[in-house]
Amino acid sequence: MGIGRVTQVMGPVIDVRFEHNEVPEINNALHIEVPKEDGALQLTLEVALQLGDDVVRTIAMDSTDGVQRGMEVKDTGRDISVPVGDVTLGRVFNVLGETIDLDEKIDDSVRRDPIHRQAPGFDELSTKVEILETGIKVVDLLAPYIKGGKIGLFGGAGVGKTVLIQELINNIAQEHGGISVFAGVGERTREGNDLYYEMSDSGVIKKTAMVFGQMNEPPGARMRVALSGLTMAEYFRDEEGQDVLLFIDNIFRFTQAGSEVSALLGRMPSAVGYQPTLATEMGQLQERISSTNKGSVTSIQAVFVPADDYTDPAPATTFAHLDSTTNLERKLTEMGIYPAVDPLASTSRALEPSVVGQEHYDVAREVQSTLQKYRELQDIIAILGMDELSDEDKQTVERARRIQFFLSQNFHVAEQFTGQKGSYVPVKTTVADFRDILDGKYDHIPEDAFRLVGSMEDVIEKAKDMGVEV
């Protein structure tokens, strides 16, 4: 346990000099007692570089206000570690595993695991492919999620990534009753606060651990909070054999924080100003999220797409690790279609007959080809109008519009804003309903009846309310 002294403070980066034989290892946690008006505050640093001359460069996990040159720094001799196990359920933590929910503190005797760990070996990995039903039609039909897989929700600012994540937490907790870990990485504190109270009201919080490093926190906390959440999830997988859900909102902020830290550490930036270690950092996080022979971690990650540019290195690097992608499209939000999932751009490794069954696969591909044909005809419609289309094309367009509207639905978590009841639609019902639309069974029902509903029964009810004979 070495003692060092602060030699330099550059925002969230602090240099510390130790005695010759006491230089701490990379990733070790160091502590500084920072004097405050109401007593001393313990600031945690993480060693990032060994500069030579017995100096290490560290990243602060909290504000460095009040830190001065010459202050004493203690080496803890180990990584940052967080509490794990059932004590974490129903609680809210920061990056260091300290509770921030105004409830009683967690006992020091509770088991704590380090946040830096090796990914599971090849011989431990499970290769079974099983579908995770979400109750969201567009997801279950066209880009189904895999149990123990990695799922990305891609979209620009304000297209509904967080709302979709909240609905998934709600549906999976209510229908499947599994344990969830939510890591809020560099997002709005208000959203985290709302999510906590919503989950408390619905009772879901009892099976959820929450870890936050939000927008207002230093880059060190935002860069490490995803690892803190993952460590809690790994315990439930490895020690208790559970199938755990890990929600990360937002994985782009993990990369963004890494970029800020990289620049402060003096590394040469790579493409678009990102850190040169972007692929390595992402790989170290993503490879730990996997299914093993003991249990599984299914991760659902919101991915902010800067300026809606999917070729940006941050979303492009994330793409490489995912099994399913759900792409949110701004044009659909403008049309009032929620969730604004692009049915043609969203993909899933699980959409094949051997996994979902032949009927589901055929319906999904037919829905996509109908929507693709409609997209191709849109230019002709814009220039010449519907009258110039052949009867077959007119029928395709009308069915495609019904499909497009029927892919929308009301969410439970949005009830307070919309005043409409949310709906959970089982996969079997979804496949059967879309088969009927494709077969022309509901061509006589006006397309407005298909907007923001659950199953076909809701469409028929809505059509009756509109005065249509069904």
UniProtKB/Swiss-Prot annotation:
Protein name in the entry: ATP synthase subunit beta
Record-level Gene Ontology MF annotations: ATP binding; ATP hydrolysis activity; proton-transporting ATP synthase activity, rotational mechanism
EC category: translocase
Similarity comment text for this entry: Belongs to the ATPase alpha/beta chains family.
Residues the entry annotates as binding ATP: G155, G156, A157, G158, V159, G160, K161, T162
Pfam families in the record: ATP-synt_ab, ATP-synt_ab_N, ATP-synt_VA_C
An example Gene Ontology CC term for this record: proton-transporting ATP synthase complex
Topological type in the membrane: Peripheral membrane protein
Organism: Staphylococcus epidermidis (strain ATCC 35984 / DSM 28319 / BCRC 17069 / CCUG 31568 / BM 3577 / RP62A)
Disulfide bonds: none
Enzyme Commission code(s) on record: 7.1.2.2
UniProt xrefs under SUPFAM superfamilies: C-terminal domain of alpha and beta subunits of F1 ATP synthase, N-terminal domain of alpha and beta subunits of F1 ATP synthase, P-loop containing nucleoside triphosphate hydrolases
Function: Produces ATP from ADP in the presence of a proton gradient across the membrane. The catalytic sites are hosted primarily by the beta subunits.
Primary location recorded for the protein, binned into one broad class: membrane
Quaternary context: F-type ATPases have 2 components, CF(1) - the catalytic core - and CF(0) - the membrane proton channel. CF(1) has five subunits: alpha(3), beta(3), gamma(1), delta(1), epsilon(1). CF(0) has three main subunits: a(1), b(2) and c(9-12). The alpha and beta chains form an alternating ring which encloses part of the gamma chain. CF(1) is attached to CF(0) by a central stalk formed by the gamma and epsilon chains, while a peripheral stalk is formed by the delta and b chains.
Subcellular location: Cell membrane
Keywords: ATP synthesis, ATP-binding, Cell membrane, CF(1), Hydrogen ion transport, Ion transport, Membrane, Nucleotide-binding, Translocase, Transport
Catalytic activity: ATP + H2O + 4 H(+)(in) = ADP + phosphate + 5 H(+)(out)
